Amino acid sequence: MVGELYRFITDFGVIEGYIIKEEPNYYLIKLKNGYNIGIKKSQIKEMENLNEKIKVGQFPKRKPKGIGNLGFIYTGGTIGSKVDYLTGGVSAIMDIEELLAIADLPYDIKIIDSPFVKFSEDLNPKDWVEIVKSIERTYKKGAEGIIVAHGTDTMHFSSAYAYYALENPIPIAFTGAQRSSDRASTDAVINLFASSIYANSNIGEVAIVMHETINDDTAIAIRGISARKMHSTRRDAFKSINEEPLARIYYPSGKLEIINKKYRKRSDKEMVAKPYLDTKGALIWVYPGFDPSILEYYRNYRGIIIAGTGMGHTSKELIPMLKELSKDLFIGITTQCIYGITHPYVYSRGRELSKFATYLQGTPEKNYVKLLYVLGKESDLDGIKKEMKRLP
């Protein structure tokens, strides 16, 4: 009975769906539109077996389109998860072919790679390196554009690292989902579709491609170092911080509209991966009552990003410790406001800090990722300072 299609004549109408669980007093039914409902047995007048069976959560295989030469890298996350209908939790991992089948992409995926499968909250900086190496492998196998399926919680960290670590990139779209891919409400279909359009475009940049609004008609491509997850659950969780998105992709037409005229075009030069990394860097958010002695822990680090208040400030109590640390390690100042700029000369506190710290633009997360990249590239403090200022 479980997994079979039934027609139920009930007190409130006729319903067709697959039985995915039977309890003493009710059936749990999966409707053909993907939603699940419960029907009390006492409300069923008649039920008919329609002689069709499924495995719960099973998807058809993808069909070749005959155009395109894209690569697909799977790293885990909600986009590749299924709901376990027995527990109600999101846990099981889908087969990659199932994931690609649900989106019915307009271009063919020719190369598939998966360096690891993790939820993004479990990723560490060394995983960013593995993603970049996977991108490099996929490119060398002939991919002309690449989609990276990734958990959304820390996707903006990974996209920022890939942005710095790849020279002359082909179009690379990081994407994910806020709803698991077997749900009727999933955002994975539009996100994967839009990512394939971006990956086949003439934009030579690493980007995050996700829903533009809560509706299913457009997605946006955001530069990898400018994207940030700004909502925990909404489909349009990712926003472009302090600059316009690169492009808008329309669904289902597939039209790509350039928004940011300062985009980098796809290059004829070979893409080169330079995955520099040193994890002896930290991101520290200051707050009222922050104890300066906390900074003692980081004395043996090589760099610190301070997410300051307002335009990049800290309390006066932190200045002596930060000044002392700056003799041996890089101190960068950014703003925890997320939107807006830092500036060292508007307030006197900024002038004090700028005597030994470097003011940086962009999000705290982007500057933390940039720091770890630069620490892996440069060996001395002067070189670190110059490179942190030079890179966007």
From Swiss-Prot:
Hydrolase recorded as keyword: no
SUPFAM superfamilies according to UniProt: GatD N-terminal domain-like, Glutaminase/Asparaginase
Alphabetized InterPro entries for the sequence: AsnA_fam, Asp/glu_Ase-like_sf, Asparaginase/glutaminase-like, Asparaginase/glutaminase_AS2, Asparaginase_C, GatD, GatD_N_sf, L-asparaginase_C
Keywords, ordered alphabetically: ATP-binding, Ligase, Nucleotide-binding, Protein biosynthesis
Superkingdom per UniProt: Archaea
HAMAP family found in the cross-reference section: GatD (MF_00586)
UniProt name for this protein: Glutamyl-tRNA(Gln) amidotransferase subunit D
Organism listed in the record: Nanoarchaeum equitans (strain Kin4-M)
Lineage of the organism: Archaea, Nanobdellota, Candidatus Nanoarchaeia, Nanoarchaeales, Nanoarchaeaceae
